[in-house]
Amino acid sequence: MIATIDRRRTRTLVVTFAALAFALHAQLARAVILPAVTIEGPSEEIVGFGGVAMAEDGTGGLVYLKRVDGVAHVFVSRYVAGHWLAPIRVDTEESFAAGSPRIGAADGGELVVVWATPFATEDEKPVDELLGATLGPGGSAFGKATIVDPDIREGIETSPDLAMSSTGQADVVYRVVEEQGRATLLRSGDVIEQVRVAHFDGERWTRLGVVNRELGISMRPPTEDNAPQIAIGPTGTGIVVWQEPELDGVARIWARRLFGQSLDYVMPASATSFGAAPINEDADAPSVAFTRLGQAEVAYRQDAGPGSPLPGPRIFVNDLPNGEAASGTEFAGAIVADSSVAGGKGALIGPPSIDLDEKESLRLLYDANGTPRVVEGTDLGLSGTFSLGPPFVQSKEQQEHSEVPSATSVMNPEGGGVSAWPSADPSGAPAVAVREDFPDGAVQTGLISGAAGGPIGELAVGRSNLGDGLVAFQQGPTGDASIVAAQVSAPPDTFVVSVPKGWLKPSQALIKWLPAASANGPLTYTVVLDGHVLATPAGATSLAIDPRDLGTGVHEVQVLATDAYGQSTLTSPSKLEIDGAPPVVKIARAMGGDGVTVSVSDAQSGLDVQAVKVSFGDGTRAGGRTVFHHRYARAGSYTVVVNVRDNLGNRGTVRERVSVR
């Protein structure tokens, strides 16, 4: 007997629909240095710039001074969702002139501002107080000013430095110059000065007191280059550094850890010798960075006069291991950050700017004879020094006073960072050079300037936890200045996509994702299936994929997040297993043509064996297995009917005509 098979199947056809021919490259877009925008000005009423700050979530703001009815007051422009908002006045209840404003930022749009203002007179001289005000998360106006320090004397060269954590705590360090005192004057021109610190716990300010180690000796006359600096971690711990002379008259750099509302002991942070020979020149321009675990990195400038063991002025760095290390009780020892500086004793070295990422890698930027020098390092030590980017360019005022331009640099937590310094465009017009370093080692640079142009004044940089940075500065001559800002924009941060695990029916394919962190919202999301874009509702964080777009098999799902500037991040592919077809049935001749073999399988969700039912057409039935053998007793025409079901419930029926001769 020879069996011939007429295959007639009553199973649903799976139709594959043509998708849009849209190719996507699964890569993270680079950050963009956006054009500068003028926040306010040019105006004769703008009389000072106080800095910029950016929180980990990408919100932030800048602060500056503007005269109202002839009196200088504090103004802030907030940065929210990738846009600068109209400036608002901070000191609305104060009638006296403000000075020395500084700003800090925390998540949710929270801002803290401090400034100095007169409140009384003594011996016909003004007595200033240091005030602070807070704009709460989601707020639109600053609260009433509170006293940080009720008496900072005349507020001359207070030079506050404010650091704020993502959790809303802040520290401020500032100087108070006394006219009278019993301190020993070590050098002509020295002053009687206190370096003070205050802590903000999120609700109120607490004065921690004076950090100087020797109140009985004089300090160098206050300048921007010898101003104290402070850094803070998310838990409220931090560090303060300052310049203070020793009894022999040489000014060194000192440091103290901060533990919330308490001060730790004083630690020397600068070198007293080099190559076994003493260093007898002043150290100045301290810069400090601090990590979550409590590691601190201090950089400073060391002068070198005649007889110095140094070949010329140099930048030194010193490491304070984190609080979890046994060696975290003292600095490791100051070392020269960059020995390749030309010019000998006459080299022009600018103040350093240093920062750390969460991997405890450092980046230091400074001006070496007009060239931007970048020093990098890891927990194993300094790893390289190089020059890249437009040159430093002095303003006319800096040239007249033989001042070297300052740089400012911040690192992103995962590596890379943003740096800025005064420079000039190809035509010689003043501009700010911006450098973006990426974690993979790539670099981009650019020049930014306000629309009205003019000389570059004070300059500041802030950074988020998302790879973004803010650059802000005062531009223009006194009496016609502007406040200018620019953003170094990063694509949306990587985010989590949730795809159901295991085999699914097409109707069960629901894709969910968490919102991507970005400073440039609102974001739009697009689901990408096997490289093809699917229509995704605006504002959605989930999508039920149309079953018609899903054939049986393994698919790749990604989600594309795009910010307001068109920068996008595409997630890594996630596997989506779809089973929309019943098990496969095979019927073949067997037993020399006198019988058939029926086999059933399912390579996707698996076969429900107990649901398998076979009718051989001659009255014989079987089930509950994956393979069946049957011999027909006599010639004839028979219809084999096989009913199957998989573990998802996909059912199928196969009918085949079998002829036996």
Sequence positions of predicted segments:
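Bacterial N-terminal signal peptides
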Residues: V14-H25
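Short flexible loop/turn segments that cap and initiate beta-strands
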Residues: G521-V527, L607-V612
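Extracellular, repeat-based ectodomains that mediate carbohydrate processing or recognition
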Residues: A31-F495
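Short beta-strand segments within Ig-like beta-sandwich modules, predominantly Fibronectin type-III
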Residues: V533-A540, G619-R625
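Exposed aromatic-hydrophobic patches
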Residues: S542-R548, V627-R631
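N-terminal secretory signal peptides that target proteins for export/translocation
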Residues: M1-R9
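Extracellular/lumenal mature domains of secreted and surface-exposed proteins
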Residues: P491-P492, P500-L514, H555-Q558, A564-R661
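Sec/Tat signal peptide C-region and signal peptidase I cleavage site
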Residues: H25-A31
